[in-house]
Amino acid sequence: METKRSKLYLLTLGCSKNMVDSEVLLAQAKANQIYLAEDFHEADTILINTCGFIDKSKQESIDQILEAIRFKEAKRIKKVIVFGCLSERYKDALREEIPEVDCYFGTRDLSQIIAELGGHYKTHLLGERELLTPPYFSYLKISEGCDHPCAFCAIPLMRGKQVSRPIDELLLEAKKLKEKGVRELCLIAQDTTYYGHDLNGKRQLAELLQRLSDLQFDWIRLLYAYPAMFPTDILPVMRERENICKYLDLPLQHVSDEMLKSMRRGISKRKTTELIAQIRSEVPGIRLRTTMLVGYPNETEEQFSELVEFVRETQFDRLGCFAYSHEEGTEAHELPDTLTEEEKERRVELLMAAQEEIAYAKNQALVGSFMPVLIERFEANFAIGRTEYDAPEVDNEVVIALDEAEQKKVKVGTFYQARITDAEAFDLFGSLVL
């Protein structure tokens, strides 16, 4: 007797790594002829891929679970299934607090989820994904988990130790993405630069980049690079391969030596400064993105000022900043959360104000230059796109005014040469060169 298949609506919360997990699950569901609903109104089952990174993420996940429960109680759906990071970490507590959820799964339970939906996990679908991104770009998750002991981070509690995927497996998946029309490939992991060390005792990111470059994607972008023990052998590859973006996402978190030691980041301010200088020297024209964490336990005003001054001196091209979240189970949770939320937000605003000045000056320097732009969408008479130096969703956009003839020619997912005509801190403006 055949098991009845579900009509599935999948809600994905959190980061791009979660999105890839959802894409793999959707490919399995589709292969099992499970109906994939575009709207929860069409579904009998809501599946929620949760995030548990910080308090704000946890609350969003819980709010969505409770909303799904209300749909179930109103008999608009039959079943609610929860999986992902929040469920991995707090499965027992969630079962006790929200028993109305039918099933809780963790981050490694794909086959069990498919079985719960009435299907069977198909091992031959290696590398198959139903893309949730636009068809012209995609993420490639090169490893799972993390071996670093950062005191503030709960990721190892949810994702476990690092497990790198074999190069041949990644190449197979990348080829399938290329066949789907993907032109920009963004490499992601908890730490991309540690890739391969668990496979044969040595890191293999340089080799992976070379072999992916050979597949002739237009852009290959490296995200989530860890600064400690940075594999400098990737720098010649980034310099010499034209389709590897001259862009690096290098989250530093802080530069005060006292803060770095307490955070257990494994690097000093001096080593950080030397690394940035080496990257910029070996890859001329590279754009650096970083992320900073302020309001960490016992961060003094002097240490925060040191961070702001470092940002001004270093002149990062892109920068994000987060207020510290006191996460239970982490080493930092044993420290007193010394700063108020208001003070943390004040520091975020001050640091971002400093970065805004830097970003404005850097963008103004681009006025009059020409660069390729990947068009992503249209708004009224404008085409919106990104340059090689901007990652999806987090960085600058280029706003291009189109005349009537251009509106008929320009297509989403296509590269066009653009002349930059004006700039703000976080946006460029331009015209097409057709």
Swiss-Prot record:
Organism in which the protein naturally occurs: Chloroherpeton thalassium (strain ATCC 35110 / GB-78)
Superkingdom, taxonomy of origin: Bacteria
Major localisation: cytoplasm
Official protein name in the record: Ribosomal protein uS12 methylthiotransferase RimO
Radical SAM core domain ranges (all copies): 132-361
Family, as annotated: Belongs to the methylthiotransferase family. RimO subfamily.
SMART domains: Elp3
Keyword Ion transport listed: no
Binding site for [4Fe-4S] cluster 2: C146, C150, C153
GO BP: tRNA modification
Enzymatic class: transferase
Cofactor(s) of this protein: [4Fe-4S] cluster
The protein's role, per its UniProt record: Catalyzes the methylthiolation of an aspartic acid residue of ribosomal protein uS12.
GO MF entries: 4 iron, 4 sulfur cluster binding; aspartic acid methylthiotransferase activity; metal ion binding; protein methylthiotransferase activity
Species classification: Bacteria, Pseudomonadati, Chlorobiota, Chlorobiia, Chlorobiales
Pfam families linked: Radical_SAM, TRAM_2, UPF0004
Enzyme Commission number(s): 2.8.4.4
Gene assigned in the entry: rimO
GO cellular component: cytosol
Residues that bind [4Fe-4S] cluster 1: C15, C51, C85
SUPFAM superfamilies (UniProt xref): Radical SAM enzymes
Catalytic activity: L-aspartate(89)-[ribosomal protein uS12]-hydrogen + (sulfur carrier)-SH + AH2 + 2 S-adenosyl-L-methionine = 3-methylsulfanyl-L-aspartate(89)-[ribosomal protein uS12]-hydrogen + (sulfur carrier)-H + 5'-deoxyadenosine + L-methionine + A + S-adenosyl-L-homocysteine + 2 H(+)
Keywords linked to the UniProt accession: 4Fe-4S, Cytoplasm, Iron, Iron-sulfur, Metal-binding, S-adenosyl-L-methionine, Transferase
Details of cofactor binding: Binds 2 [4Fe-4S] clusters. One cluster is coordinated with 3 cysteines and an exchangeable S-adenosyl-L-methionine.
PANTHER family, alphabetized: RIBOSOMAL PROTEIN S12 METHYLTHIOTRANSFERASE RIMO (PTHR43837), RIBOSOMAL PROTEIN US12 METHYLTHIOTRANSFERASE RIMO (PTHR43837:SF1)
Compartments where found: Cytoplasm
Stretches assigned to the MTTase N-terminal domain: 6-122
Transferase is among the record's keywords: yes
